[in-house]
Structures are given as structure tokens and as C-alpha cells.
């Protein structure tokens, strides 16, 4: 990679959705394509404009072929806090870098993008005319130009107090757009097989990107449900595999989750979902299995484990077993036998997940999962820890005023040893981890209090 001093600067135009997830996604994708996150900005916060240094245009294009958090990327030619600063910055940009895109045989157009303000057509034309000092020699073509240039103006984040002049102005050459259209084309509303907790398409792709899923990877989901997370990974060329304890869900049986449909159809299953999107060739298998009792031989199989464990709200947390005493001489169960299940404590579920990931992920492989938390009691120490896994990112999605879930991304940094299996018991935060077990009670406690408060308000 080229040294930082000669890296080209690029401007990322970010989507104003899932704000906490944006930075980890961009960092993960740059790492995947051999780049490194280098920026002169101190903070990103909610701003849609990010200035990055990227080794090559190819890496910038590869980044945009994957990201669902960014709208577009531009080669940054100049920027400033006022028009005069922008023009001065543009005049200092090396002419030899401009010439290949401005010569007489080329066609171009200039677009205006404003954030938090709408300009009149007259104002737009005035801004474009002010750039006449740039050495444009080509012809204007508004329909199919070879090169597109953009003026981007940032008027801040407060729609109730829009300033007269922008906080920042940018000018650059458009390189590529992101993959925001995937959110609509893979929408759960259009999907053949769905469940009560099918993951939003946008979040599914974000999880795959956080997991650095790439072509020919093997991706596993131990709580597969209706397989929404597998679809996103398969779209990026990974082979997908899953397990779930629910026999009916795995086999597409029982009551339907879709409105005005009582029972699931004969072809409602995960494989049919992949077939719907032309991704069936990436389907390995989905099995009925208990995540608390992995049936795998020792070894590393998976490049990524991406999952959304049940929280006990819409889907129950279960594992196989019985509270009854089991006779020693019990006969062997037939193949069609469906075992009795017990409740599965959240803290146990997450430690089993981390241990399983540490054992079966390849070195450098990633675990991406959702951790539900009761917001008033949450601290970073409550995030489960494992000696083989390094925490990469921790992003919050609010569910209600008192609950949220956090997208946890971890990377395997050392090989698993038997002594690592019970390392969480030695952690100073073990009692904090066990606090996850009461998430369901706290969730419904908050709901009950809210309903009571609303009823009281309506009576007054």
C-alpha cells in the first residue's frame, strides 16, 4: 500500500440511516480490500460527508460495490467552508490530475447536491458558472456524460435552523454509487419465506459487511430461523449453512407469519428464498440442531459466523433437555423423534456462541451477532468476552425507550485451547454477564409500565 503522504483523498456521501453502523462497515470493507481507514476528520458523528484517504480508485470502487451505508464516493478535488476557500483549494489541486478528465474529446456534466437545504435552479446555475476558471475543454452532455462532477454543500443537521450559507462545500469527480438499492430489492415484504423475526434486509447486508464476507467463504448461522442473514452472505458469493432448534421453521411447516395467510405453503423454506434471488448454488444445508450442544468435529470450518440469537420476546430461547429424571436404560430414540426442550438462559447462549466461534472459526474469521440489553443498566463490561476473540465494534440499535440491541463484531485472533472454554467464569464481569438472563422480564416490565402510564393519561 502506498504511504499515507501520497494517498488520494475521497469524499464519501453517507446515508443518514443506522448511523452507528456506518464507521465499522467502512473500516471492515477497506480492510477486506487491502486498504486502511485513514482520515483527517477527528469525528464523524451524524455528518453525511466523510473525507478519506484511499490507496487507489480500484479500492474505492470495490468499497462501493459492497457498502449499503454509503450513497456515493467522489475523488475530492477541493473543499472549503465558503466559496472562496473552495476556489482556492481547487486552484491548488494538481492540474495533471485534472487533465485526463477535462480534455477536448471528453463529455461531462456538473451536479449540485445539498444536504438540509433546497436550492433554486437559478442558484444552482450560479454555482456552476462560478467554476469557469477550471480548465474544462470537453463538451457538456447531460444524458450520458463520460465524467460527472459534483458540488456538495453541507447545511448542518438541524432542519429547524438552516443557515444562509453552508458549513462546508466540496467539489469532486464522481466515482461510483453504493448498494442502497439492495435494501429494496431484497426487502422482506417481497420475500417468499418469512418469520416473526426475519431480519431487515439493510441490517442483513450491514452484518455481512461487518463480517468481511467474501466470495467462496463459508458462512454459518447457528440460529438460522428463516435464513435472512444467509441471503445477504450468499449475495456476496459465500456458501451458506445454518442450524435451528425449531423443526417447523427449518422445514417450512406450521402457521405462516404473513398477513392473511394461515399456513405455510409446501415450498416455503430457506432454500426457496435463495432460489428466489438466484442464489441457490450457494446453499449448503440447514439442519435441525441445538446450538447448546454442537455436533461438530473438532476443527475450523467457517470464515464467518453471522447470527441473531432469540431474545425470548418474539421467539423463545430453547435448548434440548428435560427437567424430568431420565432413566439410564432408555431405549434409542427413532429418527423421527423431536426432543423435549428447556429454556436457554441468554448468558449461557452467548457464552456457548463465543466458545463455538472460537473453536470453529478460521484465524481472522469474524463473529457478528446481536446482543439485547436493558438500556438503564447497560455498561460496556456487559459485552461477553473470550480470550480467542477480539472486539472489533459495538453498535446500538434502539428498540424502545428502555431496551436496545447491540451489533457485536469480534475477530478470532488466536487458536482455541481447552482451557479457554470456561474462561468467562474467571472474568471480573461474570455477574454482569448473567444480567442478560432477566432481559425478557425487564422488557415486559417496561411495556407494562408504559401501558399503565398511557391508561392513566387517557383517564385524566
Swiss-Prot record:
What catalytic activity does the UniProt entry give for this protein?
guanosine(10) in tRNA + S-adenosyl-L-methionine = N(2)-methylguanosine(10) in tRNA + S-adenosyl-L-homocysteine + H(+)
- Per its UniProt record, what InterPro entries does this chain match? DNA_methylase_N6_adenine_CS (IPR002052), RlmKL-like_Mtase (IPR000241), SAM-dependent_MTases_sf (IPR029063), tRNA_mtfrase_TRM11 (IPR016691)
Q: What is the enzyme's class at the highest EC level?
A: transferase
Q: What is its EC number?
A: 2.1.1.214
Source organism superkingdom = Eukaryota
Keyword Nuclease carried by entry: no
Q: Where in the cell is it found?
A: Cytoplasm
One GO CC annotation, please? Answer: cytoplasm
Q: Which parts of the sequence carry N-acetylalanine?
A: 2
Q: What would be an example GO MF term here?
A: tRNA (guanine(10)-N2)-methyltransferase activity
Q: Which GO terms describe its biological process?
A: methylation; tRNA processing
Q: Which UniProt keywords apply?
A: Acetylation, Cytoplasm, Methyltransferase, RNA-binding, S-adenosyl-L-methionine, Transferase, tRNA processing, tRNA-binding
Tagged with keyword Cytoplasm: yes
How it assembles, according to the record, is: Part of the heterodimeric TRMT11-TRM112 methyltransferase complex; this complex forms an active tRNA methyltransferase, where TRMT112 acts as an activator of the catalytic subunit TRMT11.
| Family (UniProt) | Belongs to the class I-like SAM-binding methyltransferase superfamily. TRM11 methyltransferase family.
Reported function: Catalytic subunit of the TRMT11-TRM112 methyltransferase complex, that specifically mediates the S-adenosyl-L-methionine-dependent N(2)-methylation of guanosine nucleotide at position 10 (m2G10) in tRNAs. This is one of the major tRNA (guanine-N(2))-methyltransferases.
Q: What is this protein called?
A: tRNA (guanine(10)-N(2))-methyltransferase TRMT11
Give the source species: Bos taurus (Bovine)
Amino acid at each position: 500500500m502506498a504511504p499515507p503522504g501520497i494517498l488520494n483523498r475521497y469524499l464519501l456521501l453517507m446515508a443518514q440511516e443506522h448511523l452507528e453502523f456506518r464507521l465499522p462497515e467502512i473500516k471492515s470493507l477497506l480492510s477486506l480490500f487491502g486498504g486502511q481507514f485513514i482520515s483527517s476528520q477527528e469525528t464523524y458523528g451524524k455528518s453525511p460527508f466523510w473525507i478519506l484517504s484511499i490507496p487507489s480508485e480500484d479500492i474505492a470502487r470495490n468499497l462501493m460495490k459492497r457498502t449499503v451505508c454509503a450513497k456515493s464516493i467522489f475523488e475530492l478535488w477541493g473543499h472549503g467552508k465558503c466559496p472562496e476557500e473552495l476556489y482556492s483549494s481547487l486552484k491548488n489541486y494538481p492540474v495533471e490530475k485534472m487533465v485526463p478528465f477535462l480534455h477536448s474529446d471528453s463529455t461531462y456534466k456538473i451536479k449540485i447536491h445539498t444536504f438540509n437545504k433546497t436550492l433554486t435552479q437559478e442558484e444552482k446555475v450560479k454555482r456552476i458558472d462560478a467554476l469557469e476558471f477550471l480548465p474544462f475543454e470537453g463538451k457538456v452532455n447531460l444524458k450520458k456524460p463520460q465524467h460527472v462532477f459534483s458540488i456538495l454543500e453541507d447545511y448542518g443537521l438541524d432542519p429547524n435552523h438552516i443557515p444562509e450559507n453552508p458549513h462546508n462545500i466540496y467539489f469532486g469527480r464522481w466515482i461510483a454509487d453504493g448498494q442502497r438499492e439492495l435494501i429494496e430489492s431484497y426487502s422482506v415484504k417481497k420475500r417468499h419465506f418469512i418469520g416473526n423475526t426475519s431480519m431487515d434486509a439493510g441490517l442483513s447486508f450491514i452484518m455481512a459487511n461487518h463480517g468481511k464476507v467474501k466470495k467462496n467463504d463459508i458462512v454459518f448461522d447457528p440460529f438460522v430461523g428463516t435464513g435472512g442473514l444467509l441471503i445477504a452472505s450468499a449475495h456476496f458469493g459465500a456458501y451458506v449453512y445454518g442450524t435451528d432448534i425449531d423443526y417447523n421453521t427449518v422445514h417450512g411447516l406450521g402457521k405462516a407469519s404473513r398477513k392473511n395467510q394461515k399456513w405455510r405453503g409446501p415450498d416455503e423454506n430457506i432454500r426457496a428464498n435463495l432460489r428466489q434471488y438466484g442464489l441457490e448454488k450457494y446453499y449448503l444445508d440447514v439442519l435441525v440442531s441445538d446450538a447448546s450442544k454442537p455436533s461438530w468435529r473438532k476443527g475450523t470450518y467457517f470464515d464467518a459466523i453471522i447470527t441473531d440469537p432469540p431474545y425470548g420476546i418474539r421467539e423463545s430461547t430453547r435448548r434440548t433437555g428435560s427437567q424430568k429424571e431420565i432413566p439410564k436404560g432408555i431405549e434409542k430414540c427413532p429418527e423421527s423423534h423431536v426432543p423435549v426442550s428447556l429454556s436457554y438462559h441468554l448468558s449461557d447462549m452467548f457464552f456457548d456462541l463465543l466458545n463455538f466461534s472460537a473453536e470453529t472459526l478460521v484465524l481472522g474469521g469474524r463473529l457478528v451477532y446481536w446482543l439485547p440489553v436493558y438500556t438503564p443498566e447497560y455498561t460496556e463490561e456487559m459485552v461477553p468476552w473470550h480470550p480467542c476473540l477480539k472486539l472489533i465494534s459495538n453498535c446500538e440499535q434502539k428498540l424502545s425507550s428502555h431496551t436496545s440491541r447491540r451489533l457485536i463484531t469480534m475477530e478470532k485472533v488466536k487458536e482455541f485451547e481447552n482451557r479457554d472454554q470456561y474462561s468467562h467464569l474467571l472474568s471480573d464481569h461474570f455477574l454482569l454477564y448473567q444480567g442478560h438472563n432477566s432481559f425478557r422480564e425487564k422488557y415486559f416490565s417496561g411495556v407494562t409500565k408504559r401501558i399503565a402510564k398511557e391508561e392513566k393519561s387517557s383517564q385524566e
